[in-house]
Amino acid sequence: MSERGIKWACEYCTYENWPSAIKCTMCRAQRPSGTIITEDPFKSGSSDVGRDWDPSSTEGGSSPLICPDSSARPRVKSSYSMENANKWSCHMCTYLNWPRAIRCTQCLSQRRTRSPTESPQSSGSGSRPVAFSVDPCEEYNDRNKLNTRTQHWTCSICTYENWAKAKKCVVCDHPRPNNIEAIEFAETEEASSIINEQDRARWRGSCSSGNSQRRSPPTMKRDSEVKMDFQRIELAGAVGSKEELEVDFKKLKQIKNRMKKTDWLFLNACVGVVEGDLAAIEAYKSSGGDIARQLTADEVRLLNRPSAFDVGYTLVHLAIRFQRQDMLAILLTEVSQQAAKCIPAMVCPELTEQIRREIAASLHQRKGDFACYFLTDLVTFTLPADIEDLPPTVQEKLFDEVLDRDVQKELEEESPIINWSLELATRLDSRLYALWNRTAGDCLLDSVLQATWGIYDKDSVLRKALHDSLHDCSHWFYTRWKDWESWYSQSFGLHFSLREEQWQEDWAFILSLASQPGASLEQTHIFVLAHILRRPIIVYGVKYYKSFRGETLGYTRFQGVYLPLLWEQSFCWKSPIALGYTRGHFSALVAMENDGYGNRGAGANLNTDDDVTITFLPLVDSERKLLHVHFLSAQELGNEEQQEKLLREWLDCCVTEGGVLVAMQKSSRRRNHPLVTQMVEKWLDRYRQIRPCTSLSDGEEDEDDEDE
């Protein structure tokens, strides 16, 4: 066969294309151009392409910039024919596999007894590769890279392996560091009996490409001290029958092929937490890994240690479970500003979808002139009282993941907006917690559903009901909105009048906001949502808009009480929900379950059982001024006494012993929706399982005792 007849191998899929092809027939990748061989330009000693290429024959003896591989270096007739004679071509993807492989390394297809592209001489020699002399280029193959590892140094920026002579990285021009030792994982022949040398070669390539934007760990440890103990993982997975191993072989191999360098570092850090190896955690942190990363099902299967690892665990979970106080202090410092959020709706997606279907099924449109949508179920979300039974470190972890700490701080500390009454927050167990939600324009709808059903408005079911209600009942809501805007402007001394066309334009803008997913909503939309819920909504919010410099820009106008005034009182519930507002963002304010109260308010008669949780929501601010009631008509407007009377008609109100006017929010776990209760239990079980172990081991001894 002449040199013109030699095909060129695609550097992406290894398919061998005809010399005339400029793109790969399989993956359409561009044909590789000439490879850079030396640092300085050189003149070829001979035009004979059949002569063996020798790195030492380059002018001045300069070292290669890019290590040539089997597909990029000049082809030699003898070695090319021997290479094809030793490997067998896959009938599915044409990948050239080593003779001892019984399955294709790329697609895992079974090897045929005689491949169509295999030469007659090689068809019967699959048991042992034919010995052949290695040319000077063969030392750069993946098979022989281990022997020349000390001749390279790894760039700490792009992870490219440069020759020892290079003073800076060939790819990114980063200066050569003082320490040239590189961290490599699973490169030795003894690391695993399952991964063959082609797997390791492809894995190393994926590490270089997948982590080119991340800093490799600049650790001073040697490879043997920080590399992943793959043999321990392999041996742990070898427990079981031969049939089970054969079934799991393909799955485990696929998982390993997808793993990148950062993934192995993360698994190494997880094992390091269990075994008390702080160096593994430092290596993962130095590589830029996410401390809040959670274990996936595939990673747990690869670790194969159920007594120690579980899906969803982070390094913090493991440190708490195995009582690694020194590691916990380091990890909590790292994640204090960027804690991974985990609300109940995230733990069980199947239950969350069922709840969304329940909400959609409970939405109905009332017949008649006021054709507004409404919910048929009364549901109030509260944090379970079982949280208090968890260890303090686990409680702190739970609150970091479910609460919005920034909102909580702004509403409590920067301004006394919630929990300002010690009587309500402590003695009456009515402390409010700000739940974390999405920060987009859907935060109002998310917070409303979180305060009731504990989930997001992911499918925009509530937004659609909001838009349809505004559109179908436009006349009713428009009249209320127009009268309220006129009165509010006059109350601030702004006496002006608008043409009807201007009012209509502003109203059309409000309607358009309701129909756009992600668009921010206004006070009118809260008023409509109170009618959809058929219950009052109390908003506790900051009073002023402020710039990033802290300058006051204007009034927010969100704080107050929103009553479903267009419904009959008998059609509505008197148990309100509470929302928090902070600089363009709404959050659900929920309480924690308590045992209920008998007669805590002056003049209040609460005939409740022990299962009912009563939360006392203040109807006054920290200065004891009554909260505004929004969207009142001209007949309903009056002095503070008249507004308080109106509040008592629409809410279950009482006055505490401290003289605070409050509204009672009632909820019951037994009477709550069963799907919500089940979702909360599954979410709480996640934290119950990370209790610190009583023993110094990983809990395996306890399991053995139980089995006995």
Curated annotation (Swiss-Prot):
Active-site residues (renumbered): C443 (nucleophile), H585 (proton acceptor)
Q: Which PROSITE patterns match?
A: OTU, ZF_RANBP2_1, ZF_RANBP2_2
Q: Where in the cell is it found?
A: Cytoplasm; Nucleus
> What SUPFAM superfamilies does UniProt report for this protein, alphabetically?
Ran binding protein zinc finger-like (SSF90209)
**Which molecular function GO terms apply here?**
cysteine-type deubiquitinase activity; K63-linked polyubiquitin modification-dependent protein binding; zinc ion binding
* Entries under Pfam families matching the protein: AnkUBD, OTU, Zn_ribbon_RanBP
Q: According to its record, what are the GO cellular component terms?
A: cytoplasm; nucleus
Q: Which UniProt keywords apply?
A: ANK repeat, Cytoplasm, Hydrolase, Metal-binding, Nucleus, Protease, Repeat, Thiol protease, Ubl conjugation pathway, Wnt signaling pathway, Zinc, Zinc-finger
Q: Where are the zinc fingers (RanBP2-type)?
A: 3-33, 84-113, 149-178
Q: Which CDD domains match?
A: OTU_ZRANB1
Any idea which positions bind Zn(2+) 2?
A: C90, C93, C104, C107
Compositionally biased residues, Polar residues: 206-216
Q: Where is the signal peptide?
A: none
Q: Which residues bind Zn(2+) 1?
A: C10, C13, C24, C27
Q: Where is the OTU domain?
A: 432-592
Principal subcellular localization: cytoplasm
Q: Does the keyword Aminoacyl-tRNA synthetase apply?
A: no
Which intervals of the chain are annotated as region Disordered? 38-73, 200-223
Give any single GO term for biological process: positive regulation of Wnt signaling pathway
Ranges occupied by ANK repeats: 260-290, 313-340
As its record notes, the protein acts as a catalyst of: Thiol-dependent hydrolysis of ester, thioester, amide, peptide and isopeptide bonds formed by the C-terminal Gly of ubiquitin (a 76-residue protein attached to proteins as an intracellular targeting signal)
Residues engaged in binding Zn(2+) 3: C155, C158, C169, C172
Its quaternary structure?
A: Interacts with TRAF6. Interacts with APC.
Q: What is known of its domains?
A: The RanBP2-type zinc fingers, also called NZFs, mediate the interaction with ubiquitin and determine linkage specificity. RanBP2-type zinc fingers 1 and 2 (also named NZF1 and NZF2) specifically recognize and bind 'Lys-29'- and 'Lys-33'-linked ubiquitin. RanBP2-type zinc finger 3 (also named NZF3) binds 'Lys-33'-linked ubiquitin and shows weak binding to 'Lys-6'-, 'Lys-48'- and 'Lys-63'-linked ubiquitin chains but it does not interact with 'Lys-29'-linked chains.
What is the official name of this protein in its record? Ubiquitin thioesterase ZRANB1
Origin species: Bos taurus (Bovine)
